[in-house]
Amino acid sequence: MSENKLNVIDLHKRYGEHEVLKGVSLQANAGDVISIIGSSGSGKSTFLRCINFLEKPSEGSIVVNGQTINLVRDKDGQLKVADKNQLRLLRTRLTMVFQHFNLWSHMTVLENVMEAPIQVLGLSKQEARERAVKYLAKVGIDERAQGKYPVHLSGGQQQRVSIARALAMEPEVLLFDEPTSALDPELVGEVLRIMQQLAEEGKTMVVVTHEMGFARHVSTHVIFLHQGKIEEEGAPEQLFGNPQSPRLQRFLKGSLK
């Protein structure tokens, strides 16, 4: 039986009276690639951001590597991680690749990837440098580009640096929030190829995506979110080959044109 890496149970998120997530659950075992698809506004990115507490969920529980995250209410009634050290640990185990790269503009490519291993993991500069060089090479960023600042890179290169930065933490699960949606069409393929390579190597990944080809051919499991709820989920061949929900049928018909 595969080792469970991430278990999200009955997650809710409310903004005042407006409920964005209405009880979403997800289980990722080692090597799983879970794609979350759905229309804009369905709650996909909010769900991902709640998993590592970039957004505070309103209800629910999260288990990472068998460890239940201890949650308490903040003054606004939302859930937060009770212990700052546990939050820090959580974010080393679940690392995020963002839609808009979120690289530090005042740091070189190499410094961007070294920063968190030094500040969060406590690696020496030499150890962090070796790790950064290794993962930058893995995503196809050569030594010449490593000394550049993000502004001098293409969008595809910046996103590959962002993936290297996430990998440098050597996390349990990689979270991808629409990693290709800010890219020019001709740059999408280079990022998807890296993600496919990571999947083939057995990395555990949760991916919010509009790339139906990736969801269909690389995922082990697909979740279709609609208005904050799971409308349908299952193996990709089931969801794409024989969708049961009329909403999913309509969504796929529009997406696969």
UniProtKB/Swiss-Prot annotation:
Annotated localization: Cell inner membrane
Gene Ontology MF, one: high-affinity L-histidine transmembrane transporter activity
EC number, UniProt record: 7.4.2.1
SMART domains tied to this protein: AAA
Pfam families the UniProt entry points to: ABC_tran
Bilayer topology term: Peripheral membrane protein
PROSITE patterns, sorted: ABC_TRANSPORTER_1, ABC_TRANSPORTER_2
Source species, domain of life: Bacteria
GO biological process, one term: L-histidine transmembrane transport
Signal peptide: none
Subunit structure: The HisPMQJ complex is composed of two ATP-binding proteins (HisP), two transmembrane proteins (HisM and HisQ) and a solute-binding protein (HisJ). The HisPMQ-ArgT complex is composed of two ATP-binding proteins (HisP), two transmembrane proteins (HisM and HisQ) and a solute-binding protein (ArgT).
Primary role: Part of the ABC transporter complex HisPMQJ involved in histidine transport. Is also part of the ABC transporter complex HisPMQ-ArgT involved in lysine/arginine/ornithine transport. Shows ATPase activity. Responsible for energy coupling to the transport system.
Identification of the protein by name: Histidine/lysine/arginine/ornithine transport ATP-binding protein HisP
Source organism: Escherichia coli (strain K12)
